[in-house]
Amino acid sequence: TLGWAKSIGGLKALIARVQPGWVSDHICWTGVDHANLHDLLPMPCTEAALKHMVERVQRVQDFLGQRIALENASTYVAFANDDMNEWEFVSELAERADCWLLLDVNNVYVSARNHGFDGRRYIDALPSGRIRQIHLAGHEDHGDYLIDTHDHPICPGVYDLYAHTL
């Protein structure tokens, strides 16, 4: 769309001006029908969504003339029609789109607690050669679930998962 061309053109100009080591964005969606929902919403972990994301990432990388890094987002819900888990989705996306990963260890920790999986399994499944950067952060603990807020100290569990990553 025209809006996409304007925003991506502005990004390309900014990259030319500041020359960052890399550019990143979250693996998520944030709106529908031109309405911004002001949150990072999880991608359905389906082959159709994966194909869509690969095409979009390749289009952006082709336009920018460089690889981008994609960051895993914290998730709070899953889709009933998911046909793969999140780490399979992220790994396949990185490989098929030939992009970097920005691994947010806190986001893995939050998602693991919220969905009841082992975060180490997520980390171990990622193509380590594609990890360009690692983020650590804090979150809010609401007992039954965690929310990624970046406004609390990093907890020991996130540090443990980070040590496992290294």
Enumerate the predicted regions with their spans.
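Gly/Pro-rich active-site loop or hairpin
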Residues: 40-44, 50, 111-166
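Active-site beta-loop-alpha junctions enriched in small/polar residues
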Residues: 1, 27-28, 73-75, 106-110, ...
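Conserved, mostly hydrophobic/aromatic
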Residues: 23, 104, 134
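A short secondary-structure junction signal
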Residues: 79-83, 105, 112-115
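Proteins with a high burden of low-complexity, intrinsically disordered sequence enriched in S/T/G/P/A and R
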Residues: 1, 6, 151-155
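Active-site acidic/histidine proton-transfer and metal-coordination neighborhood
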Residues: 3-101
